[in-house]
Amino acid sequence: MQSNNKLKKNQDFRMVYQKGRSMANKLLIIYIVNNNLEYNRIGFTVSKKVGNSVVRSRVKRLMKESYRLNEGKIKTSHDIVFIARPNCKESTYKEIESALLHLIRKMKLIS
């Protein structure tokens, strides 16, 4: 994932939360909004409720890797934010990947 494909500014995250559609499952929440660009911009959020910094970083790395490996299947021109729920801290990579793909399918983002 290139650095220009990441959501970084608080203003960008707020816009996705306010104007985007959302869906959730046991492990993750997804927010999505069209961005009129030729690529997706992605943001990952893990709250302090999930655990200490080591746990939060692990969960964020697992989410990023799950997205990276499936990036080619996902339609472009969207801003997407993934939020980890507290159940994520005990989850394996496969569980997080299947939860992420489940949400992407539900939002009809698979090309």
Curated annotation (Swiss-Prot):
Pfam families with a match to the protein in the record: Ribonuclease_P (PF00825)
EC nos: 3.1.26.5
GO molecular function, one term: tRNA binding
Cysteines paired by S-S bonds: none
Keyword line: Endonuclease, Hydrolase, Nuclease, RNA-binding, tRNA processing
Enzyme class, broadest EC rank: hydrolase
GO BP term, pick one: tRNA 5'-leader removal
The keyword Nuclease is annotated on this UniProt entry: yes
Substrates-to-products reaction catalysed: Endonucleolytic cleavage of RNA, removing 5'-extranucleotides from tRNA precursor
Superkingdom per UniProt: Bacteria
GO CC terms, sorted: ribonuclease P complex
Record function comment: RNaseP catalyzes the removal of the 5'-leader sequence from pre-tRNA to produce the mature 5'-terminus. It can also cleave other RNA substrates such as 4.5S RNA. The protein component plays an auxiliary but essential role in vivo by binding to the 5'-leader sequence and broadening the substrate specificity of the ribozyme.
Cited HAMAP family: RNase_P
Subunit structure: Consists of a catalytic RNA component (M1 or rnpB) and a protein subunit.
Similarity comment: Belongs to the RnpA family.
Name by which UniProt lists this protein: Ribonuclease P protein component
Protein species of origin: Alkaliphilus metalliredigens (strain QYMF)
